[in-house]
């Protein structure tokens, strides 16, 4: 893990390969990504070897099989390294480019004292038992706020991932997307779906959030161990339209929590919406391509 309270196992790799890095002004330079190498690495044999076989489990609710509505836009982040394990969770968020994920900042950037942005990340939506039903998606660019990149400020532990097209399609065209909130509340009935790094399938729990602080939310449900960082907190989910609103992602205080039964999230306020606008506009930091 990245630290005592981290929900993610991060290895920041200093490998320079071609990608366009999209960063916030003042943010640490992004680490480039190699889409061809990453795709070649994740063949089916490696996916099956990454984790032991088993079945998904649902906390305090009904099981959601692969491809179920609640988990449709959620996937595991894998890093191109020898360990072969997924390390975080991410989900599709609506954007004009139809190519955007939301996750925890600490999943994609080491923050203060770290090595900057992660390299060779791939996203596998609906991952289960070594299967990638919607393909393996490579990363175009990563984005976190400078308050995270420079100071590891827990109130800015949210990041965005822009994906490359896959087979001529964008991720939102394939899976749909949830949206960001327009209000700034503390209490929401949410579905939280994520990938523990010791399992080969997601877990899901439904519960009501509460206020941890003026800038943080809290969610109580068991089983959210390492690997669940970045898991979306989805409210107002419609099984008919298969859409909902993301009001949080596991991260923030204690990088999401140091106990698997209590999780935290940054409250998705103006700072996150500003970061989102920079992600969808393709703005870059001074000196970046």
Predicted features and spans:
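Acidic glycine-/aspartate-rich tracts in secreted/extracellular proteins
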Residues: 107-108, 127-130, 165-168, 197-198, ...
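Cytochrome P450 catalytic-core helices
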Residues: 103
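Protease-domain processing segments flanking chymotrypsin-fold serine proteases, especially trypsin-like
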Residues: 2-3, 26-95, 278-289
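Conserved catalytic-core segment of clan PA serine endopeptidases
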Residues: 60-83, 93-94, 109, 114-168
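Catalytic nucleophile loop of clan PA
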Residues: 223-249
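C-terminal cap/linker of serine protease catalytic domains
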Residues: 247, 253-289
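Chymotrypsin/trypsin-fold serine protease catalytic domain
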Residues: 139-140, 154-227
């Amino acid at each position: 893990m990245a630290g005592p309270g981290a929900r993610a196992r991060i290895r920041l790799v200093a490998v320079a390969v071609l990608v366009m890095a999209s960063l916030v002004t003042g943010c640490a330079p992004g680490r480039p990504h190699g889409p061809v190498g990453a795709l070649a690495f994740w063949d089916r044999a490696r996916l099956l070897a990454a984790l032991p076989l088993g079945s998904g489990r649902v906390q305090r609710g009904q099981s959601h099989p692969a491809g179920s509505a609640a988990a449709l836009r959620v996937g595991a982040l894998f890093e191109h390294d020898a360990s072969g394990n997924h390390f975080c969770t991410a989900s599709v968020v609506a954007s004009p480019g139809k190519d955007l994920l939301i996750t925890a900042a600490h999943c994609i950037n080491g923050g203060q004292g770290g090595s900057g942005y992660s390299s060779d990340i791939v996203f596998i939506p609906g991952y289960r038992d070594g299967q990638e039903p919607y393909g393996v998606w490579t990363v175009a660019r990563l984005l976190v706020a400078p308050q995270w990149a420079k100071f590891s400020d827990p109130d800015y532990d949210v990041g965005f991932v822009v994906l490359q097209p896959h087979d001529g399609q964008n991720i939102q065209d394939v899976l749909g997307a949830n949206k960001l909130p327009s209000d700034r509340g503390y209490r929401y009935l949410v579905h939280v779906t994520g990938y523990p790094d010791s399992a080969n399938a997601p877990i899901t729990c439904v519960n009501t959030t509460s206020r941890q602080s003026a800038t943080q939310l809290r969610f109580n449900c068991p089983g959210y161990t390492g690997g669940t960082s970045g898991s979306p907190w989805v409210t107002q989910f419609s099984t008919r339209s298969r859409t909902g609103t993301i009001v949080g992602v596991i991260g923030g205080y204690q990088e999401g929590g140091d106990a698997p039964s209590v999780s935290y999230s940054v409250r998705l306020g103006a700072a996150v919406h500003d970061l989102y606008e920079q992600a969808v506009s393709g703005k870059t930091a001074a000196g970046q391509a």
